[in-house]
From Swiss-Prot:
Na(+) binds at residues 166, 169, 172. This is ATP-dependent protease subunit HslV. It catalyses: ATP-dependent cleavage of peptide bonds with broad specificity. SUPFAM superfamilies: N-terminal nucleophile aminohydrolases (Ntn hydrolases) (SSF56235). Belongs to the peptidase T1B family. HslV subfamily.
Length: 181
């Protein structure tokens, strides 16, 4: 799978709050095609947050499949994620999808990849954090620093971390979208 350009999706958990944020930039090769895309959404009647990096059409297909898995497994996020990853890895058509997902509920934050990975990041002092996309390393570093050395709420940690990622990563802009639990 080739690296994805054109997005940063960040998920932060602190004090019982979960915030998922994304930038709005869509890049095709070396051209910015759109600056206000929504890459995060609510699933399972608002109980789950999901964000994507990669091909948009592929991500929407994966959102649909993931929502079905959530229904099949009584909204168990880890179980639904593992079942989607198994299907994604073994189905010939799904294997060609080029996207990554971050999914979260109040207890779990997971990253799903087309390689069949389901990763739950280690907790960090003050909460939990994960990001995908080209600006992920910058957003994670900033969020971890803020979680460990400030009392900012989850939403503000996500906002400041995404602003920093937008300043550094040329494939990430500052038109931010947030979803919260």
């Amino acid at each position: 799978m080739r690296p994805f350009h054109g997005t940063t999706v960040l998920c932060v958990r602190r004090d019982g709050k979960v915030v998922m944020a994304s930038d709005g930039q869509v890049t095709l090769d070396k051209t910015v095609m759109k600056s206000t895309a929504r890459k995060v959404r609510r699933l399972a009647e608002g109980a789950v947050l999901a964000g994507f990096a990669g091909a948009t059409a592929d991500a929407f297909q994966l959102f649909e499949l993931f929502e079905k898995k959530l229904k099949e497994h009584a909204r168990s996020l880890p179980r639904a994620a593992v079942e989607l990853a198994k299907q994604w890895r073994t189905d010939r058509m799904l294997r060609r999808l080029e996207a990554m997902l971050v999914v979260a509920d109040r207890e779990h934050i997971l990253v799903l990849s087309g390689a069949g990975d389901v990763i739950e990041p280690d907790p960090v002092p003050g909460g939990g954090v994960v990001a995908i996309g080209s600006g992920a390393p910058y957003a994670v570093a900033a969020a971890r620093a803020l979680l460990g050395h400030s009392a900012l709420p989850a939403r503000q940690v996500a906002e400041e971390a995404m602003k920093l990622a937008a300043e550094i990563c040329i494939y990430t802009n500052a038109n931010l979208t947030f979803e919260e639990l």
